[in-house]
């Protein structure tokens, strides 16, 4: 897994191409990310990775072991930690600051991890997209789940059965999104579309897209289309975030 960054979903806006085409984008703003700990196969950890942290925290909100961990590596107290598997940990050191221009550039494909919007208790039609029952001929259960099992054998409801329950507020990873533009002065990037998980001001983690062999051809086509967008972007276009 390559190096990524911890950021915040800000909101949506749009950018214009030279031919006047409007491209909807989501703004992701990054605080300063710190390398907290460097792990390698040559240490007791036994594998190559970087522990990255962001968003400064108050001491009263952290446990004593975590406070000691931050002080040991000479970094500020941080609220969010994430570990990225890397091939070159020797190029980094504890306390090093990571910024968006060091990791992402326009034209990249990225994967975005976040917590989806919580929608509370929901029925099967909303939660699982069930069709429901007929609306006519005296049917009494229009939005019900229907049968949930068999008979004496197996005599139970199968684990994983799609039923009503809590909808959303779960980890989601959206793959293969486009980086349209980078804003180094704001430490932010613009990602094409609105597919990022979670609400505005929610924490997201961006990583370079994992190359999946089955989708290699479509990924290359995506990158060609994205390169056209990047080359034809109107640089002077305002990127003010829309209020939501």
From Swiss-Prot:
For this UniProt record, give its keywords in alphabetical order, as a comma-separated list: Ribonucleoprotein, Ribosomal protein, RNA-binding, rRNA-binding
Q: Which GO terms describe its molecular function?
A: rRNA binding; structural constituent of ribosome
Q: List the disulfide bonds.
A: none
Mind naming one GO cellular-component term on file for this protein?
cytosolic large ribosomal subunit
A Pfam family reported for this protein in Swiss-Prot or TrEMBL:
Ribosomal_L3
Q: Where are the transmembrane segments?
A: none
Taxonomy, superkingdom: Bacteria
Q: NCBIfam families, per this entry? A: L3_bact
Q: What does this protein do?
A: One of the primary rRNA binding proteins, it binds directly near the 3'-end of the 23S rRNA, where it nucleates assembly of the 50S subunit.
Q: How does it assemble?
A: Part of the 50S ribosomal subunit. Forms a cluster with proteins L14 and L19.
Per the record, the similarity remark reads: Belongs to the universal ribosomal protein uL3 family.
Protein's name according to its UniProt entry: Large ribosomal subunit protein uL3
Q: Which organism is it from?
A: Aquifex pyrophilus
Q: Give the classification, highest ranks.
A: Bacteria, Pseudomonadati, Aquificota, Aquificia, Aquificales
